[in-house]
Amino acid sequence: MAENVTCPEIKDILSENECLENFGGLGVNVYIFIKSDLAAPLEPEAGKNTYAALTAASFKKGKGLFKFECQDGGQGHTWENLGFRHGFKQTLDYVLESVNAASAYVARGLNNLKCGYIIEDGDKSIIVYDKLHDFKYDSGNIKGDTGKKPEDERTVTLSGSLSPTMYGRYE
């Protein structure tokens, strides 16, 4: 039997309703969790694109969030629709300033583990997670670069996506 789904209410979105200036970019911290470390799959609040705050009780004993300090101005979250009634694709880009054996080790884990991501956006946090679909890094989207000249920056650049999701952004 087909499930009836209610469309979200359409409302005014005005910049004067936001108590912040509309600057691009995100905070320098990216928090990562492994989906299998959750005590139970996360569920958005009924009819909304928000999750309850994660606490220690959200995770199995001894598990939790990993914090990555990233390059200032290197993080971005974009989303796009996948067509009528096909949901959205979310993309997360972030840049680590550490290029060494530890960052290569972590990059391998991120490439192969099923993870969720939390990114600071002003006084809110964007949550890139879906209990049914996995965040993926396509070929070539995790790159380490030591640079060639002394003035070059040493970075690990990561760009992955999650699709389909019901909304383009979850908080």
Regions found by a protein language model. Give the residues of each.
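Short acidic DE-rich linear segments
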Residues: 1-3, 170-171
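Solvent-exposed edge beta-strands and adjacent loop segments
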Residues: 3, 8, 12-93, 135-150
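Oligomerization/assembly interface segments of phage tail-like spikes and tubes
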Residues: 79-101, 151-166
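Short, acidic/charged, Gly/Pro-enriched secondary-structure junctions
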Residues: 105-131
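Short, conserved charged micro-motifs
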Residues: 101-108, 169-170
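Mixed-charge, glycine-accented linear interaction segment located at domain edges/termini
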Residues: 131-171
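Hydrophobic side chains in beta-strands
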Residues: 32, 96, 119-121, 162
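Generic "edge-of-domain/loop-turn" microfeature
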Residues: 38-39, 99-101, 124-126, 165-167
